[in-house]
Structures are given as C-alpha cells and as structure tokens.
Design a protein with these regions (language model features):
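Protease-labile, long low-complexity intrinsically disordered regions enriched in Pro/Ser/Thr
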Residues: 1-209
Length: 209
C-alpha cells in the first residue's frame, strides 16, 4: 500500500485570517464556515523550535510558546487522525511535508473544515465510496518584525545568502518592505530585491538541471 500526497495553487478565502503585530501578538479572526477545533502555532528561529497547540478562537493569541527543541510531528499526526485519516496515512503525510512545514519561520497549521473543501473542490466518485475522508492542512505564514528587519538589512547590504533562506516567501515579504520604505531607500531596495530573486531562480534552475 502506497500513499500519494499533493499540493496545488488555488485562490479562495481561508476560514481563518491571521496577522502578527510588532509586539508579537497574533490576531486570529474566523472568517468562514465550518468548525476548527485547534491550531498549532509553530516557530523555527535558526533551529530553535517552539510550538503550542491552541483551541481555535477569535481574538489575540500571544506567540510565545516555550523553546522545546522538539518538532510538533506527533501533534500534527494526532490532528490529522482526529479529522479522518488513518494513523499510517497521517504519519506518511507528516513525513512527506516535514521539511516544508517545519522550515525556518513562524506559521500556524489547522485542518480546513470539510464543508469548505467540498465547496472549493467538489468530488464525485462513481460508484460512490463507502467512506471518503478529505483532510486538507492549511498553513498560514506569519511575517515577524524580526524577519522584516532582517530582510531589510540584507537587501540594503545586498546579502544574497541571508535573503535566500526565505525562499519563495522572499518576493512577497520584500514587496511589502519596498512599499513601506522611504523615498530615499525605495529604488535601491527594489533593485536589490529583483537582483536577489533573479539569483535565487538561477540557482534553482541549475540545481534542477
């Protein structure tokens, strides 16, 4: 028996919106149908791991879990099983996405409510299956003030290695920095951002080749 997991690109409103302010508080707002029992707040800061399982609710949640140096793999698996996967499936899913889910950064995870999945991606099986479990994990990246400051410094210094660790998120964060920059810095930051992103794409293409 083998498992196949996939991800794709889509554009729709997620049931939870989250933002982080300068004080490190995460504002969580429920904005869609369906029930979400819990979320996992996770942070990887240069290998220092923090995470905490919280009940999903509107309001402010302070992102200051203790440094555990432990991965939330078991908590992720338990959350997947609670939403319909078999233990073997949950274990395989976490192993498949581990490097991406637990890379450096701050993010939250939760399982998208089934009714949201069915409305966005209707599924029709003929003949009908006895049972169907559809478990989609939502990952929301939180841009911390520390990350914004680090990227700003790296852009001004043209420090490509420091920028490269932000991977596919660099352009989105960088655009926000450019938009909020002073007139004096905006053009330089824009040029450095384009240069860094081009260098990263060239490196990726070489590795793929």
């Amino acid at each position: 028996e083998k498992f196949l997991f996939y991800r794709g690109v889509g554009r729709f409103t997620l049931p939870i919106a989250a933002t982080m302010d300068a004080a490190g508080q995460v504002s969580i707002r429920k904005q869609g149908p369906g029930r979400i029992d819990e979320i996992i707040l996770f942070s990887n800061d240069r290998g220092r791991l923090r995470y905490e399982v919280r009940r999903a609710a509107d309001g402010l949640v302070t992102v200051d879990p203790p440094v555990t140096d432990q991965e939330p793999s078991l908590e992720l698996q338990r959350m997947l099983v609670a939403n319909g996967l078999y233990p073997e499936e949950a274990n395989a899913m976490v192993k498949t996405w581990r490097d991406s889910w637990l890379e450096e950064g701050t993010r939250l995870f939760y399982v998208v409510p089934r009714r949201v999945i069915d409305s966005v991606l209707p599924l029709d099986i003929n003949p009908p299956a006895d049972d169907v479990a559809r478990v989609f994990v939502a990952r929301t990246e939180l841009v911390t003030p520390a990350a914004t400051n680090e990227i700003t410094r790296a852009l001004l210094a043209n420090d490509i290695p420091a920028l490269a660790k932000y991977g596919r998120f660099l352009e989105a964060i960088g655009r926000r920095i450019v938009e909020n920059a002073s007139e004096a810095d905006r053009m330089l930051l824009e040029q450095r951002l384009q240069s860094a992103y081009a260098a990263m794409m060239t490196f990726r293409d070489r590795c793929a080749g």
